[in-house]
Amino acid sequence: MRVAWYWFRTSFHRRWTNYLTIVLLVGLVGGIAIGSVGAARRTQSSFNVFLASTNPSDMNVLLYAPNLTSKLSRPPLVRHVEVTTFADLGFPAGRHGAPRLPAAMTSGDVTGLGSVNGELFSQDKLAVTAGRMANPNKVNQFVMTAAAEREMGWHVGQAVPMYFYTTAQENLSTFGTAKVKPSLRLTMHLVGTVVLNDEVVLDEVDRVPTFMIFTPALTRPFVGTGVHFDNYALQLDHGARDVPAVEREIIAALPRGATYNFHVTSTVSGQVNRSIKPESIALGIFGLIAALTALVIAGGLIARALQRDDGDLEILRALGVNRMMTASSSLLGVLGAIVTGAVLADVVGVALSPLSPIGPIRAVYPDGGVSFDWPVLGLGFVIVVVALAAAAVALAQRRARRTAVHQRMLDLSSVLGRHACSETSAFR
């Protein structure tokens, strides 16, 4: 080993450019490969990560009935229930004490969504894409989806005078005029743009209605004023496994003729994951292509670097160094370059991680920034080192054998030459 180390130190100044080329190629192209595979995994898991960050419900049931929160909490498998109510409680203030009825609201494209006991604030939490979340204890703060803001022509930071009415008032024939006095007058502050956790990926048909969302502090006083469409978000003891049993219990407990609509979170999750799968597959394939490219080109550079050592290896063989020592002498620098390049590849892969995930989840992804995907980093490092080191060892041994054969041929030629000279002298 001392011979190999001595040979490496004395020849490094002539070969450092070869080693640097191997390091940069393996590090940069291999890093792109590792980064791409990591991005593929991060993209594919992005919706599950986002959904988990919202404290999701396991199922929802939409009912047109008086508030049934306590009744729906009774089934043994139900751990917690929170409620939102679909009701146009508030309208922009118009002239002379009458509400203004925008076309977006009268058509149903934009509707009010009020949190009753914390739904959308502590469970199925909204993802904020601009501004901030409304304070659930403030009556004069609200948030909207981006589509609702466009429909209404409002923006984050805007103060909107609004009138609020009970269900009974809205059912009066004179509603919409100054004859019906609002139950509450407020200057509402639009503090944020949000995305619901089940609306990150939407089909065209699901884009309406879209929502302006009011706090529990504002919604609670209006909940008991009439019958609304209420959405009950249920968290179950054993997650999606309990959904069929709870559905049966709810259906059995409802009044005859009641209409209901179930919404299962795991179904939505599966649909979204399937929709982003093509992007993650494309990233994974690109990463594999980059990895193969790095290995093939690096293998060629290693072969060229070892070929340049042939002259020195012949000298070492002539000095009596055995074949194994000859091979290790030429491998020391190359193996060091391979390991350094593999480390650099992991560094590049980590540096590229803030570019992922890609796709619709990126805007709401909670864990953006640098990511250390240790399975990808570790496996990538091992593959690069093992594959290139194996190729380097095989090439070095092959060249060492070739050098040994060449040296024996030279020795044989020398012996034959001396023998021929001796015979010539004797003949004379």
Locate predicted features.
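Membrane transport/envelope proteins' first extracytoplasmic loop
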Residues: 1-295, 299, 304-308, 323-324, ...
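Transmembrane alpha-helices
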Residues: 334-342
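Cytosolic juxtamembrane regulatory segments of multi-pass membrane proteins
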Residues: 376, 411-428
